[in-house]
Structure formats: C-alpha cells, structure tokens
C-alpha cells in the first residue's frame, strides 16, 4: 500500500492538484492507495467517484499539518502493509515518524531559501529523513544540490500528463478562427494569481506589438486576478 500525503488535491484546481491527482490515479492502478489531503468545500461529491480512499483534514493551517501527520502516523501503526509514503511537499513529511520509505516531490520554489538560513536548516533536517527526492526538472535538482540536499537521493521525473482527449471539430474551428493570421502566438495556462505575473507579460506585449503587429497572447484559467488582468488589457488597448 502507498500513502499519499498532499496539500494540493482535486476538486481544488491547479497545476500541483493535477500532478498529485495524476500520480495517485496511476499508482492506484497497481497497488492500494490511501490519500490524506486538505479539506475542500466540494470534496464529498469528488471523493465518492474515486477508486481509492481519501481522508480530508480541515482546520487552520498550523493545526491542520499536525492533525494530518498524527492521522498518517496512526494509520501506519495499524497497517503493516504500507510500503512507502509519498508527499507533495517536504512540510507534509516533516512530522511523519516511520521507518517506511519516504518519497518527496520538489518543485524549486519551496526549497529556494538562502543556504545557512533558518528555513534552509529546517529543510535539510526534513530531507535528512527522506529516502528519495523526485525533482521536476534538472534545474530543480541542481537547486536542491546547491542548497545542500544529498545529490544521491535525487532523481528527475518531469511532470506527466494524461493522454489527450479527442477534441470536437467545433472547438478546433473556433480556435482556428481566433488564431487566424496571428503570429507569434503566446499562451499561459494557469490560475490568475499575482505570483504568476500575467501583468508583466501583458505590459511587455504592448511593446512587442510594435514589432509584431499580429502577435496574440491567450490566457487560459481563472482566479482572483482576472478582473485586474482585464482592466490592464483595456488600459493598454490590447483587448482585440
């Protein structure tokens, strides 16, 4: 049995949520999987449709971490067939007390703290008790080595994707009409969060349009920055 401990899981939407969902679904094809995930308002409808067991943990962030770790530790004590624990973040494994194999995914931002800082020392202490580190890119692996994580523990596995679904012809025609005579073509697929920096691309687009009058930038997603992005696009007269 595999245990998956995650802070990012559907029905919440996002890149990490998709990654952990895909990983869990793939693992469930070959072995039993138990998931410990954060609470989400619409989790019941979602969780009823899956083939594996999910425990949801709510409450404020600090207490939620401790509660989840307690539940995982108790589950491992009672289930001798657990072979490993897989987590989306080093903090998800920080309080897990077990001799079972521990695997942690890394993505770069969460480990990017100055070497020797309090955060860095805390990270290294956590990774000293982790057996395998899975980096999402060579860049992330090199960053991990640079901040002090044992290189021998790290392997690189690029994020996977589900096989593409067949797209209906009307959607293809709509996309072709939208992109007709447009070049270069830029696209961002993400949540509309401040840290994604959509506004910087849009501001650069105004200058690029002087060089490439037929350039198009398509933003796909949703989020709290949506209205601000639309407002900036209008102000720069880029909303064709």
What is each of the regions a protein language model found here?
Residues 12, 63, 92-94, 103-118, ...:
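A short, histidine- and acid-enriched strand-loop-helix "catalytic/donor-clamping" loop
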Residues 39, 139, 160:
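Carbohydrate-associated surface elements
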Residues 220, 230-240:
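Nucleotide-activated donor-binding/catalytic signature segment of Leloir-type glycosyltransferases, i.e.
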Residues 1, 168-185, 237:
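Nucleotide-sugar donor-binding and catalytic loop/hinge architecture
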Residues 178-196, 202-205, 218:
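Conserved donor-binding/catalytic core segment of Leloir-type glycosyltransferases
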Residues 86-92:
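Short His-centered aromatic/hydrophobic patch
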Residues 114-115, 145, 160-177:
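Acidic anion/phosphate-binding donor-loop and adjacent secondary structure
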Residues 6-13, 19-64:
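N-terminal strand-loop element at the rim of the active site
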């Amino acid at each position: 049995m595999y245990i998956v401990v995650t802070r990012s899981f559907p029905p919440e939407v996002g890149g990490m949520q998709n990654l952990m969902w895909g990983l869990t679904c793939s693992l469930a094809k070959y072995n039993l999987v138990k998931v410990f995930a954060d609470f989400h308002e619409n989790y019941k409808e979602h969780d009823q449709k899956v083939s594996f067991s999910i425990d949801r943990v709510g409450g404020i962030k600090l207490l939620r971490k401790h509660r989840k770790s307690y539940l995982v530790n108790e589950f491992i004590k009672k289930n001798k067939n657990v072979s490993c624990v897989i987590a989306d973040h080093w903090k998800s494994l920080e309080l897990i007390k077990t001799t079972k194999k521990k695997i942690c995914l890394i993505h770069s931002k969460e480990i990017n703290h100055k070497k020797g800082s309090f955060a860095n020392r805390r990270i290294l202490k956590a990774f000293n008790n982790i057996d395998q580190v899975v980096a999402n890119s060579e860049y992330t692996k090199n960053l991990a080595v640079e901040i002090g994580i044992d290189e021998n523990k790290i392997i690189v596995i690029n994020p996977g994707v589900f096989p593409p679904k067949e797209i209906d012809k009307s959607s293809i025609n709509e996309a072709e009409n939208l992109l007709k005579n447009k070049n270069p073509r830029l696209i961002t697929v993400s949540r509309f969060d401040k840290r994604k920096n959509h506004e910087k691309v849009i501001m650069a687009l105004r200058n690029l349009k002087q060089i490439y009058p037929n350039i198009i930038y398509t933003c796909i997603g949703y989020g709290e920055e949506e209205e601000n992005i639309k407002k900036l696009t209008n102000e720069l007269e880029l909303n064709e």
